[in-house]
UniProtKB/Swiss-Prot annotation:
Name of this protein: GILT-like protein CBG03282
Localization of this protein: Secreted
Keyword Iron attributed: no
Keyword field contains Secreted: yes
Length: 220
């Protein structure tokens, strides 16, 4: 009886230890990781992150089915208000009017292709372009669900401005303290490390069991 009691205490201790360890390291045991990112169309930091962290991460880990992602083209020092007449929206952006148009174009694409798997390549292509004409020429050439003329018309319309302004609601709900772009939330919490090495950070901290696509655990 003493041996049974001793074994029970021992295995109970191991069970509690595993639970505490799992909580402390924030490992996501088989569940999906939810990532929400906010950025600005002509922000160099956003552009670098999307090109060198966001897109490569998705190409490596998207097939695992473990990542949920959403992007909102709305950053800091950005405001959208109803016009005096009340029939339009007036927006001002951190990097000027051209950025607003790029953000609006991205918002139009996200409306047309609501699934992240569909819109991410196009939104990344638009990101950082000098203007929407250059973005349209570079990003709407291949046969797709998107018509260049329709997207351009949307971007510079009341509807496009309204779509863009709607993304402000997500800032208010999920990132009211946002003071930097890109602003990246993982499972509802902001991690600056996700800006510096998204792929490595996700693999080291959030995805378990670790997919074969992940690099060796060396940092986090």
């Amino acid at each position: 009886m003493t041996i049974i009691r001793t074994l029970f205490v021992y295995y109970s201790f191991l069970f509690i230890l595993v639970l505490c360890s799992s909580k402390d390291t924030e490992v996501n045991n088989g569940e999906k990781v939810n990532i929400v990112a906010f950025g600005e169309g002509r922000c160099s930091d956003t552009s670098f992150w999307m090109k060198w962290h966001w897109l490569p991460m998705w190409r490596m880990l998207g097939s695992t089915g473990r990542i949920n992602f959403e992007y909102h083209p709305y950053g800091i020092k950005t405001t959208c208000v109803d016009s005096d007449s009340g029939d339009d929206v007036v927006c001002e952006c951190h990097h000027g009017a051209r950025e607003c148009l790029l953000n609006q174009l991205q918002a139009c694409v996200i409306e047309a292709l609501p699934n992240f798997e569909e819109y991410m390549e196009v939104v990344t292509c638009i990101q950082g372009k000098q203007n929407i004409s250059m973005a349209a020429e570079a990003c709407f050439n291949e046969p797709s669900k998107l018509e260049r003329a329709k997207m351009m018309s949307c971007a510079d319309s009341r509807h496009g401005r309204k779509l863009f302004s709607d993304h402000e609601n997500f800032v208010a709900q999920m990132a009211p303290e946002m003071d930097w772009a890109p602003w990246i939330l993982i499972n509802g919490k902001r991690y600056k490390e996700a800006e510096e090495d998204l792929w490595q950070f996700l693999c080291d901290r959030f995805i378990d069991p670790r997919p074969i696509h992940c690099p060796k655990k060396i940092i986090y």
